[in-house]
Structure formats: C-alpha cells, structure tokens
Regions:
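Hydrophobic faces of well-ordered beta-strands that scaffold small-molecule active sites
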Residues: 2-8, 31-33, 64-69, 124-126, ...
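Active-site acidic/histidine proton-transfer and metal-coordination neighborhood
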Residues: 13, 17-18, 22, 59, ...
Length: 329
C-alpha cells in the first residue's frame, strides 16, 4: 500500500517537533515538508541541518518523500504586487521591485532543489506563478500572441531552474491550480510544450481544483501518466444547484455559505477517490498519497485524523491476476 503523508503547509503555526508528534497520533506514515515556518528552511539547509531533519522524522517513524515550496515558486512568473509581501520572506521580497523579486525567487527555487538533494528527496512540489493569469477572461479581447508571450516567459524563467533540477536528479511537480501557468488539462499540455517536454517538469496531482472547474480530474492522470510525480489527496464540494457566488467565488471568503464550491475534509466532498485510486494503479504510481487538509467548517485535528483513515481505507493494490482466469481450469 502507498504511504499516507501529511502536507505540513496548513500547519506552519506548529513547530515541526510538535507536528511530528501529532502526525503520528493522527495516523500518518510520513510528512511532506513545507518550506515555511520551521518545517524546512531552504536558506539554512546545510548538510547538518538536513541530517537533523531526517533524524527528527526517523525518531517518530515518519517517512519523507518530498518538500514543497509553493510560496516562493509563485513569485517566479507573477506580476508582483503588495500581496506577495505577505507570503514571501523579506530576503526574497526585498525592496519589492518586481523583476528583482522574480529573480530572487528563481534563485531560491534552484536552492530548493539543491536542498532537496541534500535532504535525500527527489521531488519538489510547488507553484510557478503566471504573467497571464489576469488574462483568463478574454475581455478586453486577448490576442493569441499575448497568451503565447506568457508561456514563453514561463519557459524562459523555469527552464534554467529545471536544468539545475535535472542535473541534481530532482523533479519539480507543479500543483495545477488557479493563478498558475497550468490550471487545467489544456493549459498543462501547453506548459509542457513550452518547456519542450523538459523531463524534470511534471505534476503534483491534486483533483480538488480541477473538479469544481468542471475539468476531468481522472483523465488528467491518464493524460500525464509519466509526469505524475506526486499526489495530493484533497476533497472539494460543489453545489448541484445555482448559488449566489459562482465558480469565481464572488470575492467571498472560504466557508461562506453563498459559495458554489469549498474545500471539504476527505470523503465529504464530490471527488471520486475510488476512480482516482484505480487510475493511479493503472499508471503504476507508487509514490505517497499526501493529504492536503482544508475544511473551514471542521476542527483540523478531527479532520486530519479522519482523513488519514479515509485514505488508508480507499487505497488498494492492483490485482496481479485476471479474476476470470480460474474459469479455464
């Protein structure tokens, strides 16, 4: 059975020592370390630092398969504004000059790959940002050249990062998500094409942001079977009837009952995890199933505990025989 891990990004208010203790109590087999809080600090990731992290997890019998640096990755391609100051450390945001922020973020993503190699993991999950997300809705009219320029900008900024990852034996797994260069199947295909199929680029598969958009989240697994480097298990619910705030959210906050969609604890939303597991089996995905737990209406300790149990219950190994072969005996 695949290991069930907990993504620590939503738990950065807790020390890594405390979270290790709790993750064991919740029922997890390992952690996916976020590169914020004290969970994994890229700028401090010397050999000794990485060894101490490995020893801490080993003390709690927790495995480690990946690290995640979504916040820094977001700044590599984004049009930088005051929002980024809230998610970036001062050494990356600096004076806020947009190109300077993007360059420092790119250098930090290279450093993240180097730190991952020292830590002994071969996957870095994260975001890419996008210079063209604001062009999502084609009015005022958006020309094809404007979109092409956005993908070209993405490739120019990320190819040097990915070249470094390839040399290190590390892969970058983009979490396909609104505000990124890829947010559905069509844009994911275009991102791969823009990178000339770079072998170090793939996906941290997360069905939640695909489902409420109306994207075939099971087909995503088959379409990119050789580029599913990591899997996030996250559920989302969306309404079967019209709501006051639609897919775009109506500038409401998560948890607002007027919303069309919202994150749910695993097993309590609309995502069909049965079909996801079957698809992962068919492509022979052997990596971790990492819970990214979000549900604004539920206590997180309760939710993270039930999520670990849910994933272990829904996962199953593929068959190694044809069930009807016995009919021939």
């Amino acid at each position: 059975m695949r290991p069930v891990t907990l993504f620590t990004g939503q738990w950065a208010d807790l020390s890594i020592e405390t979270l290790c203790q709790q993750a064991v109590e919740f029922g997890y087999d390992g952690l996916e370390l976020a590169c914020w809080g004290d969970h994994f600090e890229v700028d401090q990731a010397t050999e000794d630092y990485c060894q101490a992290k490995r020893e801490l997890l080993a003390k709690h019998n927790l495995a480690l398969f990946s690290i995640s640096n979504h916040l820094i990755g977001q700044a590599v391609c984004d049009a930088i504004d005051s929002r980024h100051q809230a998610i970036l450390p001062p050494r990356i945001f600096g004076d806020g000059d947009p190109e300077g922020v993007r360059q420092r973020a790119a250098a930090e993503m290279i450093a993240t790959g180097q730190a991952a190699a020292r830590l002994g993991v071969d996957v870095v999950n994260g975001f890419t940002g996008s210079s063209i997300w604001h062009l999502l809705y084609s009015f005022p009219p958006v020309s094809p050249d404007m979109i092409e320029a956005g993908f070209a900008d993405f490739a120019a900024r990320w190819k040097p990062i990915l070249d470094q990852y390839q040399a290190l034996g590390v892969k970058f797994a983009l979490e396909v998500h609104p505000t990124e260069i890829a947010f559905d199947i069509a844009s994911a295909e275009r991102a791969i094409h823009a990178l000339d199929g770079h072998p170090a680029f793939g996906f941290n598969y997360d069905p939640s942001h695909l489902g409420y958009q109306g994207v075939d989240y099971v087909e995503f697994i088959y379409r990119f079977s050789d580029r599913i480097f990591h899997v996030h298990m996250r559920d989302v619910g969306w309404s079967a009837t019209p709501t006051e705030a639609g897919v775009f959210g109506g500038h409401t906050e998560f948890g607002d009952r007027r919303r069309y969609w919202d994150f749910r604890s695993l097993g309590r939303g609309n995502i069909d995890f049965e079909e996801i597991i079957r698809a992962l089996n068919r492509i022979n995905y052997q990596g971790p199933l990492s819970v990214e737990w979000e549900d604004s209406g539920m206590d997180r300790v309760h939710g993270a505990t039930e999520a670990a149990a849910f994933v272990k219950q829904v996962d199953f190994p593929p068959s190694d025989i044809a069930f009807d072969a016995a009919f021939e005996d």
